[in-house]
Amino acid sequence: MRIVYGLGVLLEAILIAHCAIGSFKKHDRLGKSVCIYETLTFACAIVFFVFTFVPGHTVTVLAKGLTMALFDWMLIALMFYTQYYTGAVKTFKGVQAASMIFAVLDTYMLIENTWTNKIFDIESIKAENIKVVFNNDSLWYLSLIHI
């Protein structure tokens, strides 16, 4: 079952990459924003594949952190796409800047977590599941970042 799941994730990544290449050929802002979103989604699928299938505690913690960070960046890319699609790009410059600053800080903290384990840790890696445990001390982080 794990192999079928892995093949499904890789197939999804290949299809997303194909869509990203197609949207890159569009030479307008909307096409570029779709390309960026799909490229981030492709990267997230690959990192999630690494999280699921590559053994090793440090690699698994790093991949989980990168997956969470890529979710932030995918949401920002979706925000930019929506703003380009609706024509409201200039209306939300402050929101764009705040979101980017937030994502940079969150990405730093999630990558740093690989060595500090202040946010979460991997309790066990088994064939059937990977148990991620969030630290009670990181509740301030979780309430601030992921509400």
Q: PLM ranges: what are they?
A:
Residues 17-26:
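C-terminal ends of transmembrane helices
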Residues 122-136:
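Juxtamembrane membrane-water interface segments that cap and precede transmembrane helices
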Residues 1-13, 27-114, 138-141:
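Individual alpha-helical transmembrane segments in multi-pass integral membrane proteins
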Residues 145-147:
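Conserved small/polar residues in nucleotide/adenosyl-binding loops
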